[in-house]
Amino acid sequence: RTGYAPTDVNEWLRVLSIAKSYGINHYRFHTCCPPDAAFTAADVLGIYMEPELPFWGTIAAPGEEGYNEAEQNYLIELGDKMLDTFGNHPSFVMFSLGNELWGSPERLGEILRHYKDRDSRHLYTQGCNNFQHFPLMVPEDDYYVGVRLSKERLLRGSFGMCDAPLGHVQTERPSTMHQYDDVIFPKQTEGEGASDTEEIEIQYGTGVKKVQVSKTAGGLIPTKPVVTHEIGQYEVYPDFREID
């Protein structure tokens, strides 16, 4: 076994039905697109699917350092094929340009416009958790996916120390009452102390780099719906009795 995705509808019905029984109605496919059987099963069960271009890196604009025309043309063509092949499925609701991308917001917007002109039936986003500590939206975004809206305005419950501060799952008593309303639209904006900066190490493409980030920057006030990114990244103690 290689860990490949199932390609028969019944297996996807089984997997997605389990998720639906937990109250899950949305699947994001990290840097990949599932097979036709997955969309067919999701059509039946009412699961909102988000396939994604197979890219985790930097999208530079023409003329910028790191611009790779062949790479970008390949990715754009691959996205065209995904839309043409699977786009008629009603479960194909959302589409992302990749995972934790860096580079040119303007170039990301151009690519989104290309896809929207080709197939306007779907909701599109520049990527999932792009620009990490420097969240932004481009005009072409239909929704935003990320883990934070500023250094302190966190959109999920747990973080590694490299992405500190930690989240409410790690710092507060267990609760089912936590809300993100005040994070998305803060009642009072944070201070403007732009000179109050610190150096942090961030993931950049497939490597790391050190950048200066404001400790008190107000961050992003989203104008479109918000989806939290990779919320399950924390350890739990399994109940082995569930195996049976």
Regions found by a protein language model. Give the residues of each.
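Catalytic domains of carbohydrate-active enzymes, especially glycoside hydrolases
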Residues: 11-30, 34-35
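N-terminal carbohydrate-binding accessory modules
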Residues: 1-19, 40
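Substrate-binding/catalytic cleft of secreted carbohydrate-active enzymes
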Residues: 26-244
